[in-house]
């Protein structure tokens, strides 16, 4: 279909039942890593300490932190603080403060299968502006999930998210989005 300008995935995006179960196992560990971060994250800690938690917990449970050394990325997790959109690099000199919001983006390889998720944390007393962006972002995620239907269009997901973001005074960074998971870190489809 290249003559019509359609984009054909470079590899099969459909998974077998066995592959889906392996992806779910990886995702369960990925969620457990985020839960471990939630137990320890606090005002006064560095983002490098978050990286240490992610690395140690992942390795202790048989996984591999997918970001570590991926295309030169130097850490095991992405920590995006306040206005940083994504893929922030943990650093011992970045100390969490009262009022910060931080997105912790964890990606795990378990038995050769990749999973990827992030969680937003609010530290101490955050501003009304920060509360709003966290709330609207969560609403956007939920609307996107509600728009995801078997044999539906990916554009419906993007439309639901983009519409709600714009209605609340925000925009969506078009160069960054969701992606498939499984046998590779970033698989089709790109959402």
Task: Set out the residue ranges of the language-model regions.
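Active-site neighborhoods and metal-handling regions in enzymes and metal-associated proteins
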Residues: 1-191
């Amino acid at each position: 279909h290249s003559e019509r300008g359609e984009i054909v995935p470079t590899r099969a995006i459909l998974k077998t039942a066995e592959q889906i179960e392996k992806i779910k196992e990886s995702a369960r560990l990925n969620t457990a890593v985020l839960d471990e971060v939630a137990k320890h994250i606090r005002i006064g800690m560095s983002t490098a300490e978050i990286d240490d938690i992610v690395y140690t917990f992942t390795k202790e449970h048989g996984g591999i932190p997918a970001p570590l050394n991926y295309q030169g990325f130097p850490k095991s997790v992405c920590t995006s603080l306040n206005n940083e959109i994504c893929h922030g690099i943990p650093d011992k000199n970045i100390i969490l403060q009262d009022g910060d919001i931080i997105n912790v983006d964890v990606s795990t390889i378990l038995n050769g299968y990749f999973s990827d998720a992030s969680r937003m944390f609010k530290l101490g007393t955050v501003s009304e502006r920060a509360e709003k962006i966290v709330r609207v972002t969560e609403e956007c995620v939920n609307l996107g999930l509600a728009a995801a239907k078997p044999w539906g269009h990916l554009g419906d997901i993007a439309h639901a998210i983009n519409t709600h973001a714009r209605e609340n005074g925000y925009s969506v960074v078009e160069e960054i989005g969701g992606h498939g998971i499984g046998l590779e870190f970033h698989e089709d489809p790109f959402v």
